[in-house]
């Protein structure tokens, strides 16, 4: 069968002379399909993408060894309804409105002001506190020998701010957001949505019909994009390499989240040493520990509750930076403005090459928070973040650094605590207080970014499941992960007590930041080629400039590995192994379940009673298979004396889109003939979706969606009966069945016969909302009776009770497996699986409604 992916990918035609053309719309797909090419209606597809065209797929039906697929494909082919017009819902033809995204709603002026204030408090905290420590770390190892050294260092800072936070992130990377979600995994999700690069083979063709997907017209301009897409999809090595890069970047993000609070808070508390000479380094560490404990304790209150309070505080902080900078330039002179000439960088390296090279690690710290700014995009619009950074944040930062440089040019020996020494005496203590508050805000910024990243990684199968608490009723992007919060606190306290100095922490800080930055550069480059389809010259310029600059910085910070930065690298490596082992074990488990699923031939041999007694009720069997009957169902048949009269195989599936609209949540298909009363249900969630419904609400939504599916199925069969039995000749059959229109309101119109209003005659009736059938009245009555019987059967089964059938599928490595595989699967993955949060826990099902069966797979 042919596989297709959404996004800007290809529109493969094929087979039977049919051709499909797609054009990009806001949230819907326009389809004109000749009946020969209508095979795209097959929702459940082969995971390996074999067979290039619908013709090939249909030709293989007779000889397919998987009878489950044979039956489903035959059922799909028999329902020959061909759609054109806006596809408002992948399941329900009665949907009247295209499912939209909340973020596209019009925002009022008042709301924009509130969001702007929150943007300061949530997005720019980290980058805003870099003036506290950037010059301190730059001049830590070598003293300042001349004013030209200050101008050279300042010029480095200015152009680092312009090239990394402004050019790379604000003007380019922010546009790589996945419907408002930023960060490493959002970029990976965007790539997965446009090319089948995920190592977990559970993608469905129906996933690309979610209204969050957007498709483009194939053209000459797409040729390069399609070649890259094909190469990514066919090369398992490239898929693994891409995943490894993403996991490495994510581990660095988490490591960054440990270093950022330690660095920001300790650098702010260091200001006490300037105001109170009796304060020593040990007391600074103890105060830092106390502030960090308070910080992580308050994290559970969420961003929206705190952002309105800290937003104005951070605005005052940026005003302080600008004011102090202007004061220092007025006091010590404006000669520092010469640093805007990049030649001073050349002069700096020419005079002191070793000192200049070593200072690059500290210079990079002025750009810290750039990745957090991207990862914390959340519900803020790209333009609002861009405007705030360009017109407020960047000017204030530049003025702050210019003022510190002006102070240094007149005080060459005062190369530590530069920021606090440059504060006017009258404003010292208020600024120290605001600096500590800004440092706390910066720490929250990075922690919030980590929560968002962990949620994305969990949804894409790359991190063990953890309890996630949504802290805002209005914005789904604001979350709190208790276990991760306390893990970050413990790790952060360990780093503070271990290093005890902002200079040593600063070295580790640079390594963490650069690791994330380089991964972002690679992923954005792939997006430029695959999705944005930008001119190759522009892409090469971006890659060369960004990656080249980051590698230069990286060469500098590597020199500090022996000074203690190796601890951070070990920490990141452990996180990387956890994520890789979880993804590897999850992939093996899924592939094994696919291989051991029950064949349709066996179910047919058992008959509609499945070889046991069917008792009234609905059984919801949870499994991870997106297609087929899971092998765990055989365990239920073997161990239980009876089985429910209706069985629904439920798969909770995370798709690579931020949000799945509620009316597109459930995808249903029959597993066997009607008499079996067996269905497959795929409950689809985006990685920003909130699974807040309890088990009662969930089963109510599921059953309502099942009833809609049955009505749609009956409507399509009624259309078939009318098209094939109600025409007078083969020519009329071909005309009526070649194309049909399902309107946005669910009405069905034949495109072979013009509507009466358009033709000006009633000779050929339109099949619409008030339709008249030329076919057999008996067949229509039988079809309606069959639908009523099925709906009545569902209601009776529901009244008898709904039971959740849970299978604990565990995996163990075979005896002949390599030692490393046994160690990874039998111990590490098993440990993670035992201690992670079970997916069914979110539904809070009472034990009286659960039945559990264990099954072990050998891999």
Swiss-Prot record:
Pfam families: K_trans, K_trans_C. Residues 1-112, 177-240, 297-305, 381-388, 439-478, 532-535, 582-859 are cytoplasmic. GO terms for biological process: potassium ion transport. It is a multi-pass membrane protein. Residues 763-772 have a biased composition (Polar residues). Keywords: Glycoprotein, Ion transport, Membrane, Potassium, Potassium transport, Transmembrane, Transmembrane helix, Transport. Residues 134-155, 262-275, 327-359, 410-417, 500-508, 559-560 are extracellular. GO terms for molecular function: potassium ion transmembrane transporter activity. Residues 1-19 have a biased composition (Gly residues). The chain crosses the membrane at residues 113-133, 156-176, 241-261, 276-296, 306-326, 360-380, 389-409, 418-438, 479-499, 509-531, 536-558, 561-581. Residues 54-65 have a biased composition (Low complexity). Glycans are attached at residue 411. It is found in: Membrane. Residues 1-69, 752-772 are annotated as: Disordered. One of its GO terms (cellular component) is membrane. Belongs to the HAK/KUP transporter (TC 2.A.72.3) family. High-affinity potassium transporter. This is Probable potassium transporter 14. The lineage of its organism: Eukaryota, Viridiplantae, Streptophyta, Embryophyta, Tracheophyta.
């Amino acid at each position: 069968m042919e596989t297709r992916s959404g996004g800007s990918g290809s529109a493969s035609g094929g087979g039977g002379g049919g051709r499909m053309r797609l054009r990009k719309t806001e949230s819907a797909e326009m389809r004109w399909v000749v009946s020969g090419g209508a095979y795209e209606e097959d929702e459940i597809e082969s995971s390996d993408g074999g067979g290039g065209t619908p013709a090939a797929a249909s030709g293989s039906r007779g000889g397919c060894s998987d009878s489950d697929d044979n039956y489903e494909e035959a059922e799909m082919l028999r329902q020959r309804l061909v759609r054109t017009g806006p596809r408002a819902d992948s399941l329900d033809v009665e949907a009247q409105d295209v499912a939209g995204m909340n973020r596209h709603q019009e925002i009022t002026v008042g709301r924009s002001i509130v969001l702007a204030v929150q943007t300061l408090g949530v997005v720019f905290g980290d980058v805003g506190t870099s003036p506290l420590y950037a010059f301190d770390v730059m001049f830590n190892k070598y003293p300042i020998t001349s004013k030209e050294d200050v101008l050279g260092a300042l010029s480095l800072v200015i152009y680092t701010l312009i090239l990394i936070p402004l050019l790379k992130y604000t003007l380019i990377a922010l546009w790589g957001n996945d419907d408002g979600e930023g960060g490493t995994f959002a970029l990976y999700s965007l790539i997965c949505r446009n090319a089948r690069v995920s190592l977990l083979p559970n993608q469905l063709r129906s996933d690309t019909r979610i209204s969050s997907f957007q498709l483009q017209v194939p053209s000459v301009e797409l040729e390069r994009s399609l070649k890259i897409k094909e190469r990514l999809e066919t090369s398992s090595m490239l898929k693994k390499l891409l995943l490894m890069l993403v996991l490495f970047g994510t581990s660095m993000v988490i490591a960054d989240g440990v270093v950022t609070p330690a660095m920001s808070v300790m650098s702010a508390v260091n200001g006490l040493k300037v105001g109170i000479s009796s304060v020593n380094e040990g007391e600074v560490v103890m105060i830092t520990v106390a502030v960090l404990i308070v910080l992580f304790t308050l994290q559970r209150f969420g961003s929206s509750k705190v952002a309105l309070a800290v937003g104005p505080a951070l605005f005052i902080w940026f005003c302080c930076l600008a004011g102090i900078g202007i004061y220092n330039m007025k006091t010590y002179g404006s000669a520092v403005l010469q640093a805007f000439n990049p030649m001073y960088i050349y002069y700096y390296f020419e005079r002191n090459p070793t000192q200049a090279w070593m200072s690059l690690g500290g210079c990079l710290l002025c750009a810290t928070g750039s990745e957090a700014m991207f990862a914390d995009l959340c519900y803020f619009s790209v333009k609002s973040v861009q405007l705030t950074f360009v017109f407020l944040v960047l000017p204030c930062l530049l003025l702050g650094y210019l003022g510190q440089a002006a102070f240094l040019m007149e005080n060459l020996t005062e190369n530590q605590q530069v920021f606090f020494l440059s504060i006017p005496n009258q404003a010292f203590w208020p600024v120290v207080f605001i600096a500590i508050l800004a440092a706390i805000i910066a720490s929250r910024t990075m922690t919030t970014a980590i929560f968002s990243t962990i949620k994305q990684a969990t949804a894409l199968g790359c991190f063990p499941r953890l309890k996630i608490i949504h802290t805002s009723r209005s914005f789904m992007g604001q979350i709190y992960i208790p276990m991760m919060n306390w893990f970050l606190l413990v790790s952060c306290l360990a780093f503070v007590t271990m290093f005890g100095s902002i200079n040593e922490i600063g070295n580790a800080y640079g390594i963490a930041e650069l690791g994330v930055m380089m991964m972002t550069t690679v992923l954005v480059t792939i997006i430029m080629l695959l999705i944005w389809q930008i001119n190759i010259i522009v892409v090469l310029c971006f890659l060369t400039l960004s990656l080249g600059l980051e590698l230069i910085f990286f060469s500098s910070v590597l020199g500090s590995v022996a000074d203690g930065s190796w601890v951070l690298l070990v920490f990141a490596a452990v996180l990387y192994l956890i994520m890789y082992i979880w993804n590897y074990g999850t992939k093996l488990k899924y592939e094994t379940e696919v291989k051991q699923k029950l064949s349709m031939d066996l179910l047919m041999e058992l008959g509609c009673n499945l070889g046991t007694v069917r008792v009234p009720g609905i059984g919801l069997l949870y499994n991870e298979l997106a297609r087929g009957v899971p092998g765990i169902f055989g365990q239920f048949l073997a161990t239980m004396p009876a089985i429910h009269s209706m069985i629904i195989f439920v798969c909770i599936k995370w798709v690579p889109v931020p949000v799945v609209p509620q009316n597109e949540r459930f995808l249903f298909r029959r597993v066997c003939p009607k008499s079996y009363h067996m269905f497959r249900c795929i409950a689809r969630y985006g990685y920003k979706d909130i699974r807040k419904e309890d088990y009662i609400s969930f089963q109510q939504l599921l059953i309502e969606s099942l009833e809609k599916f049955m009505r749609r199925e009956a409507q399509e069969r009624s259309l078939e009966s009318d098209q094939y039995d109600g025409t007078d000749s083969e020519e009329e059959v071909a005309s009526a069945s070649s194309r049909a229109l399902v309107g946005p309101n669910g009405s069905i119109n034949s495109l072979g016969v013009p509507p009466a209003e358009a033709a000006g005659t009633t000779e050929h009736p339109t099949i619409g909302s008030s339709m008249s059938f030329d076919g057999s009245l008996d067949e229509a009555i039988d079809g309606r009776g069959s639908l009523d019987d099925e709906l009545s059967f569902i209601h009776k089964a529901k009244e008898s009770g709904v039971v959740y059938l849970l299978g604990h599928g565990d995996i163990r490595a075979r005896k002949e497996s390599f030692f490393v595989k046994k160690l990874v699967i039998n111990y590490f993955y098993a440990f993670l699986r035992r201690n992670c949060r079970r997916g069914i826990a979110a539904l809070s099902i009472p034990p009286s409604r659960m039945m559990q069966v264990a099954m072990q797979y050998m891999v």
